[in-house]
Amino acid sequence: LWFDMITDQTHSQLISNNMDLMGLNKFLHTHYDSNMFDRFKFKFDGLETIEKNYSQAYQDMFTLSVLQGKRNGTYLEIGSADPYYGSNTALLEEFEWNGVSVEIDKELVERFKNARSNEVICSDATTLDYNEILSRISDENNVVDYLQLDCDPPEITYQVTKMIPFDKYKFRVITFEHDRWYSGDHIYNESRKLFTDLGYVRLVPNIAPDNRQDYEDWYVHPELVYPEVIEKMKITQGKIHKSEDYMIETKNKKGYGDFS
C-alpha cells in the first residue's frame, strides 16, 4: 500500500484498519514518485527534490505547478484529516509553507500535532472566525496562496465556504470538494456559481482519482496567477478528468505544458 511509504508501520496499520471499517478503497489514491519526473507535464522549480507526494489526487503537485514551485507560501486547509495520508499540505510544508489546518477529529489533530510543524485547530469548521485566521497568514495585500475546502458532507463544505470573507481576502489556488459522484448536482452547481461570481477561473473541472468518481473542481484567481500558466493548464471539457492523466504524461500523448 502506498501509505506504507510515508508513515511508520503502526500508523500505517491503523490507517488500513480504519479504511476497512469505513469500506474505503485503499488503492484509490494516485500519487507521484521521482520515477515519474520525466513524464510530469507541469515541471516547476524543486520538482527534482520530490521523492513522493501525499495528496489523494495530485492537489499538492497541482498547487506547486500553478505557483511554479513557490517556497514560503501560505495556506488555509479546511478539513485536514490525516497529517500525511491524502494530505494536500504536507508537501507544501516541505516547501517551507506556513499555514493553518482545521480538523474536527481529535485523534487526527493529535497525530497532526505530533507529525507536522504548522498550526492545526481542532474545531467544527462552521464555528470559526475565518477573518481572524486569515489575518494571521495573509500577505500585505490580503492574499493567501492556497485554500482547501474539504468537509464531509459537501453541504458542510459549502456552508463553510459562505463563511469565508472573500470580499477581503483572495486566494491564488482553491480546491473545492463537491463530491458530485455521490451527492448529486446541487452543491456542484452552487459552488461553481459562487466561485465564478467571485471572479475565480475553474482551471480543472470534475477531477477524480479514477475515471468515475468526480469529486473536486480546481480554481485559480486570474489576477494572481500568470496568464501563460492558466492557458497551459486549463481544461475546458466537462467530462471527468482522472488526476494522474492530467498531471502525468502517458505514452503517445502530448503534455499540456512545461514550466521548468
Language model regions located:
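Acidic/glycine-enriched edge-of-secondary-structure segments
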Residues: 42-52, 119, 143-152
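Class I SAM-dependent methyltransferase Rossmann-like catalytic core
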Residues: 2-72, 84
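Amphipathic, non-transmembrane alpha-helical secondary structure
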Residues: 64, 131, 135, 158-162
